[in-house]
Amino acid sequence: RRGMEHGYALCVVDDEGEVICFFLLEPPGIPKMGTWDMIRAGLLGAAWKFGLASTRRLIATKDYFEASERRVLGARAGKVSRLNRLTVLPARQGQGVGSTALAAALRDVDAPVMLETQDARNVAFYERLGFAVVDEDTCPIGEYHTWSMLREGQISS
C-alpha cells in the first residue's frame, strides 16, 4: 500500500489473472517509515507472532539499509528513486517479463534509481538494464552479501 500511495507500483497479470511480476519504484523524497508507521503497519502483531528477537532484527536490518544508502549515496541520499521488491513468478522467470516491465518503468521515470540485491545472479540482470554496482557489503544482521546498484537517468531528446 505504501508504494502505491507514494510511487510507481506495477503488477503484470497473465491471461488467467495471475500476478506474474510485481515491483515498487519509489520517487525521491518519500519519507522513510518511522517507528509509528511500522506500528500502524503491523509491527506489534509481528512481535506477537514471531517474537521480540525477530522484531528487533527486522528493525536493525531496516536501520542498516537506511544507513547503507546514506553511506553509498552521500549527498544524493534521499534524492534518488528506489526500486523495491522486484519479483517474477518462478515459472515465468527467464521469459523477459521482469526486464520488459522494468525497462518500461525506467523509461517513464527517467531519473537515477538505486536498488539492493542479495542474489548474485540478479547483478547481471540489473546490469543489462543499465544499473552498475556502486557498493558491495555484508549485512551484519544475517551475514548476507548485498550489492548496491545505481542507474543514472537517461537523457531524453
Give residue spans per PLM region:
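Conserved beta-hairpin
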Residues: 6-25
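A short helix-loop-beta-strand connector motif used in the catalytic cores of GNAT acetyltransferases and
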Residues: 1-11, 30-32, 78
